[in-house]
Amino acid sequence: MHIGGGVVKIRILILLMLALFLLGCSSNVNTNVKLKVFHAGSLTEPMKAFKRAFEEKHPNVEVQTEAAGSAATIRKVTELGRKADVIATADYTLIQKMMYPEFANWTIMFAKNQIVLAYRNDSRYADEINSQNWYEILKRPDVRFGFSNPNDDPCGYRSLMAIQLAELYYNDPTIFDELVAKNSNLRFSEDNGSYVLRMPSSERIEINKSKIMIRSMEMELIHLVESGELDYFFIYKSVAKQHGFNFVELPVEIDLSSPDYAELYSKVKVVLANGKEVTGKPIVYGITIPKNAENRELAVEFVKLVISEEGQEILRELGQEPLVPPRADTAVPSLKAMVEVS
């Protein structure tokens, strides 16, 4: 009996050890992997939807999203040394200019947008403003408007580009001067048929705060308009729709939306404080996986979701046009079946 009891105890001990081992394995399987996605502020709502869809497919993954202006988003990796698994920006060329070749080596272009002028129902002169008189409304002394910081956010330099292009479209050389130059130290200069604005460093930007407000990211202007501190702000159409704003659709010649006007858009350039020159072009968003991504396989799956038909439908539902088919600037073996290489 004594020997038999010992055998039973040994078997029980073995079973307990096996159970603990299996429990440990199970625990490891269920431990959340954190997939870090740094993205442009204007992608905040789409990223919430991508996060939900991805986590449903990958229950052991927690997608951590973090919004900022696109240039600021990239600087988190290139200057601050932070780790991200996916980077998504509102201007695909920023990835190429700021991350190649050290931090990334490919970009997929996946979505489009356009610049609009958004406002509340009770913004000053909301009942008068339209696509032909908007700049006259903004000139009025009791009207305040805003845009994001061009050094941090593509929406900022695109807003300034749109205002400068308005001078050409409306044949009025005073529009930018009256709206921006008169109220800040931001000025375009003409150079061989092109118009160039050289940005001071962010801490040296000077503005008349009774007329203009600037924030690092376009999304930070939303509450200023909602609270009545601002009457109007330049923003992407998708963001205006997502947040229920009224908006003036600017003429296609100045809203940076159409490839048909790429040559016209290219007449305006902004040199950022870091020395990078940005040329006016149709708005196209970009996505990449940094070279030092810690969860590369999952990052590839996340990018696949964004550029898939499901991802394209998510964008459409949120008022943003996907680029169909998505285009890559170089062959990406793990994604080649889903993109065109241009």
From Swiss-Prot:
Positions with a binding annotation for molybdate: 41-42, 70, 153-155, 218, 236
Q: What keywords are assigned to this protein?
A: Cell membrane, Membrane, Metal-binding, Molybdenum, Signal, Transport
Give the record's membrane topology: Peripheral membrane protein
Tell me the InterPro entries matching this sequence. ABC_trnspt_W-bd_WtpA, ModA/WtpA
Q: What Gene3D superfamilies does this protein map onto?
A: Periplasmic binding protein-like II
Key word Transferase present in the record? Answer: no
Gene Ontology process terms (BP): molybdate ion transport
List positions binding tungstate: 41-42, 70, 153-155, 218, 236
Matching entries from Pfam families are given as: SBP_bac_11 (PF13531)
Signal peptide start-end:
1-24
Compartments (UniProt record): Cell membrane
Give the GO molecular function terms. Answer: metal ion binding; molybdate ion binding; tungstate binding
Keyword check for Metal-binding, yes or no.
Answer: yes
GO CC annotations? plasma membrane
User: CDD domains annotated for this entry?
Assistant: PBP2_ModA_WtpA
| Disulfide-bonded cysteines | none
Could you tell me what this protein does?
Part of the ABC transporter complex WtpABC involved in molybdate/tungstate import. Binds tungstate and molybdate.
Enumerate the NCBIfam families for this protein. Answer: PRK04168.1, tungstate_WtpA
Q: How does it assemble?
A: The complex is composed of two ATP-binding proteins (WtpC), two transmembrane proteins (WtpB) and a solute-binding protein (WtpA).
Q: Which family does it belong to?
A: Belongs to the bacterial solute-binding protein 1 family. WtpA subfamily.
Q: What is this protein called?
A: Molybdate/tungstate-binding protein WtpA
| Species whose genome carries this gene | Archaeoglobus fulgidus (strain ATCC 49558 / DSM 4304 / JCM 9628 / NBRC 100126 / VC-16)
Organism phylogeny: Archaea, Methanobacteriati, Methanobacteriota, Archaeoglobi, Archaeoglobales
Q: Which gene encodes it?
A: wtpA
